[in-house]
Amino acid sequence: MLVFVPEPAVATRRLTPVLEAGVVAVGTLAAVAVHLQLWRAAWREPWVRGGDADFYLMVARSLGRHGSYLHNPSLGWPFGQHLADLPEGADNLHLLLLRLFAVLGRGPGAAVNLFFLATFATVAFTSHLVLRRLGCSRMASGVGAFIYAFAPYHFIRGEEHLLLSGYEMVPIGFLLALSLFDEPLPLLRERGRRGLQWRSGRTALVALAAICLASTGPYYFVFSMMLILLAGTLQSLGDRSWRPAASMGLIVGLGVLMFAVNVSPSLLMDLRHGTNTAVGQRSPFETQLYGLKISQLFIPRQAHRLDGLATAAQRSQGPIAAYQSEPGQQLGLLGAIALSVMLVAFALHAAGARRRAWLDERAATLVRRATVMAVACMLVGAIGGLSFLVSSAGLRQIRAWNRISVVIAFSTVVGLAVGFDRVTLSISRRLAGRPTRLRLAALGLATGLIVVAFADQGGSDTPPYTAIHAQYNSDAAFFAAVRQRLGAGAAVFNLPYQPFPEVSPRVGTGAYDEALGFIYQPTLNWSFGFMRGREPDYPRALESQAAPEWMTSIAAIGFTGIVLDRHGYSELDRARQEADISALAGPPTTSADGRYAFFDLRAYAETTKARLGPAGTAARAAQALALSTDTPGG
């Protein structure tokens, strides 16, 4: 077989690449520790706050406290939070790992930090194994794995896009696609034999790979299936044979089946209650907003170590936010050079140019196939590319096609690893009979590439640990005081009202900032976080009422406290709101940084319930919870 190196006959040799990959993973973690200056970090404090980072802190806390991300009775009280409308199940393996860290780390901050660091190890591990399987040397595979794990994409996604940081299955998907170019084909017997080859170690590994691909993120699953479809189709047409297409169909079918199993809670929710039209609705036009900008592959990464390159990267984004797509598409210096060389070499080969062969046929074929994969990714993912047609055909949940840059990055790593081996081969011929010098030369080349990758691909990513510590202590102390005042099980009403999920910031409050109460104090119940479009958005309806009216309603529902985020109001509105609440509930307690105000409603609630009586209280609560300014989507 052209793509795969032969399997060693000795069992211990089969473990050698695994042990090598483990060493590379540990070395990558050590480099990340230096880059992020982890000796300064406090593990329980999340290193990124705001935006989607708070969403994943919320998910980590839900996993640790309730064992599932799907239902959280502590949020969206009294309805509870139901996340089936967000198909996170496609990341079930990642969520399982996050739950493990939530239990071991005893807190969401530690869980998210540990998960993020673990992704560097898992990406390096799988990359090394795949490169070795493709026939690259031990040293070339180790260098390539480090470069790939240290990609700018990894740091820029970071904890804000936590699950996207786990792109360890991208190399596996790449390998499955390449395996379709040669015999023996996955899940099929060798030529001359009949039937399906179900009972073999290779079949089990292919099936496991397809299952894992369907469980580690919808984007990486779709990208991998796209490559598999491309490879199978090209090989079937080239060989005029049904076999590559059949193998392709079996892999894709198994992956799609497992993907459906993973997202079955979301599918069942839609079947039973109808589609929630208020959440997760995408349009083909969004592929133009979040598509791949091919020029971004070749420029320096954002927040580069060198000020001049950082400025150049910033200018390349342009002044119009609508056309900036997402950050993190850059390949880095080594990847940009590799992709340029690969594209030129492929063009010369396609044009039939005669030149002295620099690579042997096996290596040249591998690089050409990797280049085809990269070109296909660019054609599909680019703004104005085929992704618009894919979305128009129905695959609308995959809108940020710029993320396919991480697949392109691995194709360049394949080219780099093959090039590394070719250079060391040339050196070995010149240093024949001098093994010590040869080893030193190869080690020097590897070290140089690693140093360049470390300096170029890792930018100004060190978290501001001092500021993080101050903010964490202020927030933790404030919410702990709320818990101490009200006691476990009490219900707290969040102000201002922030719909959930995927909404624009309100003044200075992010989409998930109000989840912090649950993140810090999960024994309390919080009004924030019920799924819009499924439950009546009574807090929004209450906003239009005078303070005596809406405060009577929330007291009847069972809330005994209010936490007001001052960043969610203009100065005038904040002063008016606090004055109205204080007139009925007394003055607030504020956080050390002045952002949060807490109003104790226990005395007010007791007086209100006594005035209304049991029947009146129940009627008022039912009336308030039925209020809505939107029509639920099911």
Segments from the language model and where they lie:
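Periplasmic/ER-lumenal interhelical loops and adjacent helix-loop junctions
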Residues: 263-347, 517, 604-606
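Membrane-interface coil-to-helix junctions
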Residues: 31-123, 151-167, 291, 299-326, ...
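Extracytoplasmic
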Residues: 275, 283, 288-290, 436, ...
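Start-transfer (signal-anchor) and selected internal transmembrane alpha helices
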Residues: 1-39, 236, 247-254, 347-373, ...
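Signature aromatic-anchored transmembrane alpha helix within multi-pass, membrane-resident enzymes
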Residues: 229, 249-257, 419-457
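Membrane-helix boundary/interfacial segments in multi-pass membrane proteins
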Residues: 157-165, 278-282, 286, 312-334, ...
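Membrane-embedded helix bundles of polyisoprenyl
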Residues: 27-31, 114-134, 138-237, 255, ...
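Transmembrane signal-anchor helices characteristic of membrane glycosylation enzymes that use polyprenol
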Residues: 17-51, 58, 252-270, 379, ...
